[in-house]
């Protein structure tokens, strides 16, 4: 988002003609699903509120018509939580969640996914997607892990920038970076709690993804519910004005999260009444308030009383109008696509490609792929035929009462349906086995499941969690499989048949026992419309898996947090009562082929603190299957004035290699990539030796060195 000189003149002229009330209305977003006093929603439509949330189709058209009848005729901007596709619209493409798509490590596909989502959202009459989520999921007890790109700063920045480019490249919608900032690091993994972090840590760990996405053209940012070191993010002037505006040069607008201004009073207690809270939010740098219906009257009153400088209001309104002009909302210049693009064949194909690359093979004792279709396959487990569990959060039914019925579109594939599609000549027998959380029907279901396993040639066991265990206000104390799922796995194992376990879940779970019982293990996370089909294709060997984990799997909940980029301690990951290390590391994922790395080299042995250099490595597919490999590059500062993590991801490249083919992969880097944020808040690359590691996973890295003068 950059200023356009011609539009800036129009904005200044428009603001000069607006009354105070009209300006403040631009700073307010209202939803048709929030609880307000009777008539409030209609009043704001008639008055000309600046933004509307989750107002779709004909309802949005009616709001636009009402805005055109106001004195200033300023069009509203319509927002939607399109987190993994325009999934609140039944019939639109539902892609894998961010955590799922992050397993692809494929920027090109994720950019295409962003563009496809933008086209579907635009065709539905909307302008603004509340995505991407740039929080880091490093304590996976937190309920919103599935919404993130995983645990790593660098990977999140790269993938976030890709999806922003996809959203905004054709001017169809704007993106919204959230949640600013450090929200995923809340104490104890408890949603919206305080994040215990210094500003140095914020700059080092949480800020870079936002900086990358701002460079990519992001037009809006949403502040987080929580706080940093005791200062609420909705009231953090340093982060919103000094860093976001002055340092990063952000020129779009900032919106609060849902009713965040109220939380300054009720939860965080930094304001005693709504007037004080609203003033604090606006002066700190929030341009738009989401859903606090008293906001407009409060701000107008305080400006008239001299408690808020009107120039602050003018600045906020200019930030909002800048985006509206860029979108073409004025003068009938808005680009709208036909509704026929929604779930069009091109978008479905993008979803198929992305879903295939988002599945991660975690274990394979040689049973996969199934080259010959088994005569009889038992598909067992609570998530084998549960599309709600497979979709995850932020879809059209995920926030509705369980009793309501929603027809599922025909192109959705659970694992059960996928297996029937891909193995048409096999007899497919289904048994639920148990529920995710346990209920009175489990005993009978388990008996049926064991019988099905005994009579089958192979078992596809589908376990995990569901929407009741993920999302806002759904943080977990333990990540072990719930209900009787472990018991089900043991009983199926006792049947003596090969087991391919498929995990359908919103976060890494503690599945060590299940992994040991299984002959193969596949992680799908929440894989969207085509997850079950692509899983069955993987099992059949229709394609070669290439996904790798963007997040670490603990052996037990007591190891949390277990992210890879930790500072060294005396015993590193070790606890006295559990095996050292993670169950599955960040960056891990198996293939049906094997890759051999060799000839790691740097273009220069010594560089200046601001000098470019290259890192090259040879990769050969030494197996019998064509495939795609993700080469991961990590760095380590051997001696630094403050502690630095054991390793940090600083590059990756995904390449296609035919069986027997060899390629050179080159990473283009700068000495600044080796540096860190000092206690003065500035990035520095100190002189000395740096180690550079490249390989296919953290456990198989080649090493070289480079020296900074």
Residue ranges and their predicted role:
Residues 1-677, 684-698, 705-709:
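Glycoside hydrolase catalytic-domain context in secreted enzymes
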């Amino acid at each position: 988002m950059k200023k356009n000189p011609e539009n800036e003149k129009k904005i200044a002229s428009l603001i000069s003609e607006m009354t105070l009330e009209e300006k403040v209305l631009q700073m307010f977003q209202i939803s048709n699903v929030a609880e307000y006093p009777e008539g409030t929603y209609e009043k704001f439509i008639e008055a000309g509120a600046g933004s509307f949330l989750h107002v779709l189709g004909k309802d949005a058209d009616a709001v636009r018509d009402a805005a055109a009848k106001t004195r200033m005729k300023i069009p509203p901007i319509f927002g939607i939580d399109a987190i993994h596709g325009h999934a609140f619209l039944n019939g639109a493409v539902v892609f894998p969640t961010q955590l799922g798509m992050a397993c692809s490590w494929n920027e090109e596909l994720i950019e295409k996914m962003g563009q496809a989502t933008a086209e579907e959202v635009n065709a539905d009459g909307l302008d603004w997607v509340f995505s991407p989520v740039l929080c880091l999921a490093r304590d996976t007890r937190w309920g919103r892990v599935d919404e993130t790109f995983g645990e790593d700063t660098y990977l999140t920045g790269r993938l976030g920038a890709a999806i922003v480019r996809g959203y905004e490249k054709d001017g169809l919608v704007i993106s919204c970076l959230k949640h600013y900032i450090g929200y995923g690091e809340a104490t104890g993994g408890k949603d919206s709690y305080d994040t215990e972090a210094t500003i140095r840590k914020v700059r080092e760990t949480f800020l870079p993804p936002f900086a990358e996405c701002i460079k990519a053209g992001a037009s809006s940012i949403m502040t987080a519910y929580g706080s940093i070191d005791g200062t609420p993010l909705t009231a953090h002037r340093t982060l919103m004005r000094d860093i976001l505006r002055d340092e990063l040069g952000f020129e779009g607008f900032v919106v609060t999260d849902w009713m965040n201004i109220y939380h300054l009073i009720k939860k965080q207690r930094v304001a005693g009444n709504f007037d004080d809270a609203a003033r604090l939010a606006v002066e700190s740098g929030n341009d738009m308030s989401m859903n606090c219906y008293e906001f407009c009257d409060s701000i107008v009153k305080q400006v008239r009383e001299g408690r808020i400088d009107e120039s602050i209001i003018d600045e906020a309104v200019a930030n909002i109008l800048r985006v509206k002009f860029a979108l073409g909302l004025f003068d009938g210049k808005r680009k709208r696509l036909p509704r026929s693009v929604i779930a069009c064949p091109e978008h479905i194909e993008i979803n198929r490609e992305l879903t295939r690359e988002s599945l991660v093979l975690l274990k394979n004792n040689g049973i996969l792929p199934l080259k010959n279709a088994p005569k009889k396959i038992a598909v067992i487990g609570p998530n084998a035929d549960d599309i709600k569990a497979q979709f995850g959060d932020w879809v059209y039914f995920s926030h509705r009462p369980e009793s309501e019925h929603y027809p599922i579109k025909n192109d959705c594939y659970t694992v059960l349906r996928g297996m029937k599609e891909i193995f048409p000549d096999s007899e497919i027998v289904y048994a639920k086995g148990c529920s995710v959380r346990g209920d009175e029907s489990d005993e009978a279901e388990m008996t049926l499941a064991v019988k099905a396993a005994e009579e089958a040639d192979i078992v596809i066991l589908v376990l995990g969690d569901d929407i009741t265990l993920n999302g806002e206000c759904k943080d977990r104390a333990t990540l072990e499989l719930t209900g009787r799922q472990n018991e089900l796995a043991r009983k199926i194992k006792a049947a003596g048949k090969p087991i391919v376990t498929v995990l359908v879940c919103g976060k890494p779970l503690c599945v060590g026992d299940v992994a040991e019982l299984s002959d193969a293990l596949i992680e799908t996370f929440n894989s969207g419309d085509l997850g079950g089909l692509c899983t069955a294709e993987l099992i059949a060997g229709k394609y070669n898996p290439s996904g790798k984990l963007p997040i670490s799997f603990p052996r037990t909940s007591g190891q949390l947090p277990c992210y890879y980029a930790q500072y060294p301690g005396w015993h590193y990951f070790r606890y006295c009562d559990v095996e050292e290390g993670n169950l599955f590391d960040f960056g891990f994922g198996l293939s049906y082929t094997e890759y051999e790395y060799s000839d790691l080299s740097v273009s220069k042995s010594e560089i200046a603190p601001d000098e470019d250099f290259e890192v090259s490595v040879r990769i050969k597919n030494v197996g019998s299957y064509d495939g795609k490999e993700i080469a991961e590059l990590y760095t380590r500062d051997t001696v630094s004035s403050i502690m630095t993590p054991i390793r940090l991801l600083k590059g990756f490249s995904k390449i296609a290699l035919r069986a027997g083919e060899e390629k050179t992969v080159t990473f283009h880097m700068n000495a600044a990539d080796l540096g860190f944020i000092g206690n003065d808040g500035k990035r520095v690359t100190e002189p000395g030796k740096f180690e550079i590691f490249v390989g296919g996973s953290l456990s198989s890295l080649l090493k070289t060195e480079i020296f900074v003068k």
